[in-house]
Amino acid sequence: MGEALNVMESVRSIVFKESENLEGSATKIEGYDFNKGVNYAELFKSMASTGFQAANLGDAIQIVNQMLDWRLSHEQPMEDCSEEERDVAYRESVTCKIFLGFTSNLVSSGVRDTIRYLVQHRMVDVVVTTAGGIEEDLIKCLAPTYKGDFSLPGAVLRSKGLNRIGNLLVPNDNYCKFENWIIPIFDQMYEEQIKEKVLWTPSKVIARLAKEINDETSYLYWAYKNRIPVFCPGLTDGSLGDMLYFHSFKKGDPDNPDLNPGLIIDIVGDIRAMNSEAVHAGSRKTGMIILGGGLPKHHVCNANMMRNGADFAVYINTAQEFDGSDSGARPDEAVSWGKIRGGAKTVKVHCDATIAFPILVAETFAAKRKELSHIRCQV
């Protein structure tokens, strides 16, 4: 009898193990109460205490707001800083430098308009994307993209001249219009290369195309107007590459491109410019907001390695880390490379960016637009 009681007491001590007290040190999980009516601000605020990816999105909102709220005046002046850097007004004017990276599919989607809003109001400082993130923005100024379905048969769509991007449809005519628009611009750029010795980099090409499109629905137009650099090291990986390929036969030597390759684009100039954006951030903190993975994610992170890592990082993507891909890697992996600082504020939101990013912007950049409009225009 006594032995049985001892066994039961041992079992009870295992099952009913005493807990650490989390009261006051951890967020209590509770969702939004719709009995209080529909209040979107409170609904979004409640995500932080909902759990799972809603909580991660809540953390992302908090971190981006920390990026936007940071001023150099929050830090103690260094012993070797200049007189200007000691000036109180100057220190209050210095904000976090924000790098925004995103993949092309997001420009194909309606997230393009969210990106345009940020660039239009100078809420980000550096943009990195893929070739599709450039061309899709320009093409949408010429012709629209339409909603389709993920399950539409590829062979049927091909017979109709319709290209599918997930559940979006892009008529092939859009690319024909793009060719008609861009080739004369490439002709002009080639003439400037020959006669004026202009050395084109991807970012210079992008700025020129943005100037020529002259359309306020384009985020590239606003980047050009606001002098926000847009980097794309993979500029040839898309329709832009197709156009450059065709143009090289038109202006270059079709039989011996070594003698005359046509329009030349220098990628080394841009890697210097991109890395310099991080290196010369100086006393500013840097923040990374990266939508999707691949080239933009790595390019932004790698540039920040040049300054011993970013101070804030928000990733939004659905990629998994277990195949070793950079796309799926969590922020902590970037810490091991020196791309994010050890004490940085970071989060990865495992979610489709078309869902998460507009909510994030609503609760951060858009909510703070009035207070940001003055100070970020001075940066």
From Swiss-Prot:
The keyword NAD applies. NAD(+) binds at residues 104-108, 130-132, 136, 237, 293, 318-319, 352-353. Pathway: Protein modification; eIF5A hypusination. The active site is at K339 (nucleophile). Spermidine binds at E135, E136, D242, H298, G324, S325, D326, E333, A334, V335, S336, W337, G338, K339. One of its GO terms (molecular function) is deoxyhypusine synthase activity. GO terms for biological process: spermidine metabolic process. Its EC number is 2.5.1.46. SUPFAM superfamilies: DHS-like NAD/FAD-binding domain (SSF52467). Pfam families: DS (PF01916). GO terms for cellular component: cytoplasm. Keywords: Hypusine biosynthesis, NAD, Transferase. Its cofactor is NAD(+). It catalyses: [eIF5A protein]-L-lysine + spermidine = [eIF5A protein]-deoxyhypusine + propane-1,3-diamine. PANTHER family: DEOXYHYPUSINE SYNTHASE. Catalyzes the NAD-dependent oxidative cleavage of spermidine and the subsequent transfer of the butylamine moiety of spermidine to the epsilon-amino group of a specific lysine residue of the eIF-5A precursor protein to form the intermediate deoxyhypusine residue. Also able to produce homospermidine from putrescine. Belongs to the deoxyhypusine synthase family. Homotetramer. This is Deoxyhypusine synthase. It comes from Nicotiana tabacum. The gene is DHS1.
